UniProtKB/Swiss-Prot annotation:
This is ATP synthase subunit delta. It is a peripheral membrane protein. It comes from Parafrankia sp. (strain EAN1pec). F(1)F(0) ATP synthase produces ATP from ADP in the presence of a proton or sodium gradient. F-type ATPases consist of two structural domains, F(1) containing the extramembraneous catalytic core and F(0) containing the membrane proton channel, linked together by a central stalk and a peripheral stalk. During catalysis, ATP synthesis in the catalytic domain of F(1) is coupled via a rotary mechanism of the central stalk subunits to proton translocation. This protein is part of the stalk that links CF(0) to CF(1). It either transmits conformational changes from CF(0) to CF(1) or is implicated in proton conduction. The keyword Ion transport applies. GO terms for cellular component: plasma membrane; proton-transporting ATP synthase complex. InterPro entries: ATP_synth_OSCP/delta_N_sf, ATPase_OSCP/d_CS, ATPase_OSCP/dsu. The keyword Cytoplasm does not apply. Belongs to the ATPase delta chain family. It is found in: Cell membrane.
Length: 279
Protein backbone atom coordinates (compact mmCIF):
# COMPACT_ATOMS: atom_id res chain seq x y z
CA UNK A 1 0.00 0.00 0.00
CA UNK A 2 1.12 3.55 -0.72
CA UNK A 3 1.20 6.45 1.73
CA UNK A 4 -2.46 7.50 1.80
CA UNK A 5 -3.69 3.92 2.10
CA UNK A 6 -1.21 3.14 4.88
CA UNK A 7 -2.38 6.17 6.84
CA UNK A 8 -6.03 5.20 6.44
CA UNK A 9 -5.27 1.64 7.52
CA UNK A 10 -3.45 2.95 10.60
CA UNK A 11 -6.45 5.12 11.53
CA UNK A 12 -8.85 2.18 11.20
CA UNK A 13 -6.47 -0.05 13.15
CA UNK A 14 -6.52 2.46 16.01
CA UNK A 15 -10.30 2.17 16.18
CA UNK A 16 -10.05 -1.63 16.00
CA UNK A 17 -7.69 -1.62 18.99
CA UNK A 18 -10.27 0.37 20.94
CA UNK A 19 -13.26 -1.85 20.14
CA UNK A 20 -11.37 -5.10 20.77
CA UNK A 21 -9.64 -4.04 24.00
CA UNK A 22 -10.46 -6.06 27.12
CA UNK A 23 -12.11 -3.71 29.64
CA UNK A 24 -10.63 -3.52 33.12
CA UNK A 25 -12.14 -6.26 35.26
CA UNK A 26 -13.37 -8.26 32.27
CA UNK A 27 -12.01 -11.64 31.20
CA UNK A 28 -11.01 -12.91 27.79
CA UNK A 29 -13.94 -15.32 27.87
CA UNK A 30 -16.48 -12.53 28.22
CA UNK A 31 -15.15 -10.45 25.33
CA UNK A 32 -14.15 -13.26 22.95
CA UNK A 33 -17.62 -13.71 21.35
CA UNK A 34 -17.89 -9.99 20.53
CA UNK A 35 -14.34 -9.81 19.18
CA UNK A 36 -15.02 -12.93 17.11
CA UNK A 37 -18.13 -11.30 15.67
CA UNK A 38 -16.19 -8.14 14.80
CA UNK A 39 -13.64 -10.25 12.94
CA UNK A 40 -16.35 -12.10 11.02
CA UNK A 41 -18.17 -8.88 10.17
CA UNK A 42 -15.02 -7.21 8.87
CA UNK A 43 -14.28 -10.25 6.73
CA UNK A 44 -17.81 -10.15 5.31
CA UNK A 45 -17.53 -6.44 4.50
CA UNK A 46 -14.17 -7.07 2.81
CA UNK A 47 -15.86 -9.70 0.62
CA UNK A 48 -18.67 -7.25 -0.21
CA UNK A 49 -16.21 -4.49 -1.12
CA UNK A 50 -14.15 -6.89 -3.21
CA UNK A 51 -17.11 -8.30 -5.09
CA UNK A 52 -19.13 -5.12 -5.73
CA UNK A 53 -17.17 -2.54 -7.77
CA UNK A 54 -19.94 0.05 -7.44
CA UNK A 55 -19.88 -0.17 -3.64
CA UNK A 56 -16.08 -0.14 -3.59
CA UNK A 57 -15.90 3.01 -5.73
CA UNK A 58 -18.57 4.78 -3.70
CA UNK A 59 -16.87 4.03 -0.38
CA UNK A 60 -13.49 5.25 -1.65
CA UNK A 61 -14.63 8.17 -3.83
CA UNK A 62 -12.09 10.96 -3.19
CA UNK A 63 -14.54 13.51 -4.56
CA UNK A 64 -17.09 12.79 -1.82
CA UNK A 65 -16.64 14.26 1.67
CA UNK A 66 -15.74 11.78 4.43
CA UNK A 67 -19.11 12.18 6.14
CA UNK A 68 -20.83 11.20 2.91
CA UNK A 69 -18.82 7.98 2.68
CA UNK A 70 -19.34 7.10 6.35
CA UNK A 71 -23.05 7.84 5.97
CA UNK A 72 -23.22 5.46 3.03
CA UNK A 73 -21.47 2.77 5.07
CA UNK A 74 -23.97 3.25 7.88
CA UNK A 75 -26.93 2.95 5.49
CA UNK A 76 -25.52 -0.15 3.82
CA UNK A 77 -24.33 -1.96 6.91
CA UNK A 78 -26.19 -0.55 9.89
CA UNK A 79 -28.11 -3.28 11.71
CA UNK A 80 -26.31 -5.99 9.74
CA UNK A 81 -22.92 -5.89 11.46
CA UNK A 82 -21.84 -5.20 15.02
CA UNK A 83 -21.36 -1.65 16.28
CA UNK A 84 -17.66 -2.36 16.78
CA UNK A 85 -17.21 -3.52 13.20
CA UNK A 86 -19.20 -0.56 11.88
CA UNK A 87 -16.94 1.82 13.82
CA UNK A 88 -13.88 0.26 12.18
CA UNK A 89 -15.43 0.36 8.70
CA UNK A 90 -16.48 3.98 9.22
CA UNK A 91 -12.93 4.92 10.18
CA UNK A 92 -11.64 3.12 7.10
CA UNK A 93 -13.98 4.75 4.57
CA UNK A 94 -13.41 8.18 6.12
CA UNK A 95 -9.79 7.95 4.99
CA UNK A 96 -8.28 8.34 1.54
CA UNK A 97 -7.12 5.31 -0.44
CA UNK A 98 -4.42 5.29 -3.10
CA UNK A 99 -6.39 2.59 -4.94
CA UNK A 100 -10.02 1.55 -4.34
CA UNK A 101 -8.89 -2.09 -4.04
CA UNK A 102 -6.74 -1.16 -1.03
CA UNK A 103 -9.90 -0.76 1.07
CA UNK A 104 -10.74 -4.42 0.57
CA UNK A 105 -7.22 -5.57 1.47
CA UNK A 106 -7.18 -3.32 4.52
CA UNK A 107 -10.47 -4.74 5.77
CA UNK A 108 -9.13 -8.27 5.29
CA UNK A 109 -6.04 -7.41 7.32
CA UNK A 110 -8.15 -5.77 10.02
CA UNK A 111 -10.32 -8.91 10.18
CA UNK A 112 -7.17 -10.96 10.76
CA UNK A 113 -6.01 -8.54 13.46
CA UNK A 114 -9.40 -8.76 15.16
CA UNK A 115 -9.07 -12.55 15.19
CA UNK A 116 -5.59 -12.21 16.66
CA UNK A 117 -6.95 -9.80 19.28
CA UNK A 118 -9.00 -12.70 20.61
CA UNK A 119 -5.81 -14.74 21.04
CA UNK A 120 -4.07 -11.74 22.57
CA UNK A 121 -6.82 -11.34 25.15
CA UNK A 122 -6.36 -15.00 26.08
CA UNK A 123 -2.57 -14.53 26.33
CA UNK A 124 -2.15 -16.98 23.44
CA UNK A 125 -0.69 -14.71 20.75
CA UNK A 126 2.78 -16.27 20.96
CA UNK A 127 1.24 -19.72 20.59
CA UNK A 128 -0.83 -18.75 17.55
CA UNK A 129 2.11 -17.01 15.88
CA UNK A 130 4.31 -20.07 16.29
CA UNK A 131 1.62 -22.51 15.16
CA UNK A 132 0.94 -20.55 11.97
CA UNK A 133 4.63 -20.51 11.14
CA UNK A 134 5.06 -24.22 11.91
CA UNK A 135 2.05 -25.22 9.84
CA UNK A 136 3.47 -23.31 6.89
CA UNK A 137 6.76 -25.15 7.28
CA UNK A 138 4.96 -28.51 7.46
CA UNK A 139 3.32 -27.71 4.13
CA UNK A 140 6.70 -26.74 2.69
CA UNK A 141 8.10 -30.13 3.65
CA UNK A 142 5.09 -32.08 2.34
CA UNK A 143 4.51 -31.23 -1.34
CA UNK A 144 1.54 -33.59 -1.66
CA UNK A 145 -0.22 -31.97 1.29
CA UNK A 146 0.54 -28.50 -0.04
CA UNK A 147 -0.84 -29.48 -3.44
CA UNK A 148 -4.02 -30.83 -1.86
CA UNK A 149 -4.60 -27.47 -0.17
CA UNK A 150 -3.87 -25.37 -3.26
CA UNK A 151 -5.37 -27.51 -6.03
CA UNK A 152 -7.67 -25.12 -7.96
CA UNK A 153 -9.78 -28.07 -9.07
CA UNK A 154 -10.52 -29.17 -5.50
CA UNK A 155 -13.65 -27.79 -3.79
CA UNK A 156 -12.92 -25.15 -1.17
CA UNK A 157 -14.98 -27.11 1.35
CA UNK A 158 -12.70 -30.13 0.89
CA UNK A 159 -9.57 -28.05 1.49
CA UNK A 160 -11.02 -26.37 4.55
CA UNK A 161 -12.13 -29.76 5.84
CA UNK A 162 -8.61 -31.12 5.43
CA UNK A 163 -7.17 -28.23 7.47
CA UNK A 164 -9.81 -28.84 10.13
CA UNK A 165 -8.86 -32.50 10.40
CA UNK A 166 -5.16 -31.66 10.57
CA UNK A 167 -5.36 -28.93 13.21
CA UNK A 168 -8.53 -29.47 15.23
CA UNK A 169 -7.55 -30.40 18.78
CA UNK A 170 -3.86 -29.90 17.96
CA UNK A 171 -3.73 -26.12 17.56
CA UNK A 172 -5.31 -23.09 19.19
CA UNK A 173 -8.83 -22.35 17.85
CA UNK A 174 -7.62 -18.99 16.49
CA UNK A 175 -4.85 -20.76 14.57
CA UNK A 176 -7.42 -23.15 13.13
CA UNK A 177 -9.74 -20.34 12.00
CA UNK A 178 -6.95 -18.36 10.36
CA UNK A 179 -5.58 -21.43 8.59
CA UNK A 180 -9.07 -22.32 7.33
CA UNK A 181 -9.53 -18.78 6.03
CA UNK A 182 -6.13 -18.88 4.34
CA UNK A 183 -6.95 -21.97 2.28
CA UNK A 184 -10.49 -20.74 1.55
CA UNK A 185 -9.28 -17.49 -0.03
CA UNK A 186 -8.37 -18.34 -3.62
CA UNK A 187 -6.87 -14.89 -4.23
CA UNK A 188 -4.19 -15.18 -1.54
CA UNK A 189 -1.97 -17.39 -3.71
CA UNK A 190 0.83 -19.38 -2.09
CA UNK A 191 -0.62 -20.84 1.12
CA UNK A 192 2.81 -21.13 2.75
CA UNK A 193 3.56 -17.45 2.19
CA UNK A 194 0.09 -16.53 3.44
CA UNK A 195 0.63 -18.46 6.68
CA UNK A 196 4.00 -16.77 7.11
CA UNK A 197 2.34 -13.40 6.50
CA UNK A 198 -0.26 -14.17 9.16
CA UNK A 199 2.53 -15.10 11.55
CA UNK A 200 4.22 -11.75 10.86
CA UNK A 201 0.98 -9.88 11.54
CA UNK A 202 0.75 -11.67 14.88
CA UNK A 203 4.32 -10.68 15.70
CA UNK A 204 3.62 -7.08 14.71
CA UNK A 205 0.80 -6.93 17.27
CA UNK A 206 3.46 -7.53 19.89
CA UNK A 207 5.68 -4.81 18.44
CA UNK A 208 8.21 -7.24 17.04
CA UNK A 209 9.56 -8.07 13.60
CA UNK A 210 9.84 -11.70 12.51
CA UNK A 211 13.20 -12.99 11.31
CA UNK A 212 13.01 -16.37 9.57
CA UNK A 213 16.30 -18.19 10.17
CA UNK A 214 17.19 -21.09 7.88
CA UNK A 215 19.84 -23.36 9.32
CA UNK A 216 21.06 -26.87 8.55
CA UNK A 217 21.56 -27.81 12.22
CA UNK A 218 19.59 -27.42 15.43
CA UNK A 219 20.64 -24.30 17.36
CA UNK A 220 20.97 -24.47 21.14
CA UNK A 221 19.49 -21.84 23.48
CA UNK A 222 22.74 -19.87 23.73
CA UNK A 223 23.17 -19.75 19.96
CA UNK A 224 19.57 -18.62 19.50
CA UNK A 225 19.99 -15.86 22.11
CA UNK A 226 23.22 -14.58 20.52
CA UNK A 227 21.72 -14.73 17.03
CA UNK A 228 18.61 -12.88 18.16
CA UNK A 229 20.70 -10.14 19.79
CA UNK A 230 22.87 -9.76 16.69
CA UNK A 231 19.90 -9.53 14.31
CA UNK A 232 18.11 -7.07 16.62
CA UNK A 233 21.20 -4.85 16.60
CA UNK A 234 21.47 -5.12 12.82
CA UNK A 235 17.88 -4.00 12.23
CA UNK A 236 17.62 -1.72 15.26
CA UNK A 237 14.37 -3.36 16.40
CA UNK A 238 13.17 -6.17 18.62
CA UNK A 239 13.20 -9.40 16.62
CA UNK A 240 11.14 -12.57 16.97
CA UNK A 241 13.09 -15.56 15.64
CA UNK A 242 11.42 -18.39 13.74
CA UNK A 243 13.81 -21.27 13.08
CA UNK A 244 13.48 -23.29 9.87
CA UNK A 245 15.66 -26.41 9.65
CA UNK A 246 16.80 -26.79 6.05
CA UNK A 247 19.53 -29.32 5.11
CA UNK A 248 19.95 -27.51 1.78
CA UNK A 249 21.65 -24.62 3.59
CA UNK A 250 24.69 -26.88 4.16
CA UNK A 251 26.18 -24.72 6.93
CA UNK A 252 25.82 -21.36 8.62
CA UNK A 253 22.50 -19.56 8.63
CA UNK A 254 20.37 -17.52 6.25
CA UNK A 255 18.16 -14.82 7.75
CA UNK A 256 15.16 -13.20 6.08
CA UNK A 257 13.27 -10.25 7.53
CA UNK A 258 10.39 -9.39 5.22
CA UNK A 259 11.94 -9.03 1.77
CA UNK A 260 15.45 -8.38 3.09
CA UNK A 261 17.87 -11.31 3.20
CA UNK A 262 21.01 -11.45 5.34
CA UNK A 263 22.73 -14.49 3.90
CA UNK A 264 25.93 -15.76 5.51
CA UNK A 265 25.69 -19.41 4.55
CA UNK A 266 28.01 -21.88 2.92
CA UNK A 267 25.39 -22.15 0.18
CA UNK A 268 25.78 -18.47 -0.66
CA UNK A 269 29.58 -18.75 -0.73
CA UNK A 270 29.39 -21.79 -3.02
CA UNK A 271 26.99 -19.98 -5.32
CA UNK A 272 29.35 -17.00 -5.47
CA UNK A 273 32.25 -19.32 -6.28
CA UNK A 274 30.28 -20.93 -9.08
CA UNK A 275 29.47 -17.52 -10.55
CA UNK A 276 33.17 -16.67 -10.45
CA UNK A 277 34.07 -19.85 -12.33
CA UNK A 278 31.58 -19.17 -15.10
CA UNK A 279 32.86 -15.69 -15.86
Amino acid sequence: MEGASRQSLAAARSVLDQVTAVPIGATAGTVAPEVRRIAGDLSAVATLVGGEPTVRRALTDPGAPPQSRTGLAARLLGGQISQGALAVVSAAVAGRWSRPADLRYALEELAVEATLAEAEAADALDEVEDELFRFGRILGQNPQLSLALTDPAAPTSAKVGLVTRLLSGRAHPVTLRLAEQAVADREQGDIERRLEQLSRIAAARRGRVVAVVRTATVLDADQIARLKAAISRFFGRQIQLQIDLDPAVLGGVAVRVGDEVVDGTVLRRLAAARRGLTR
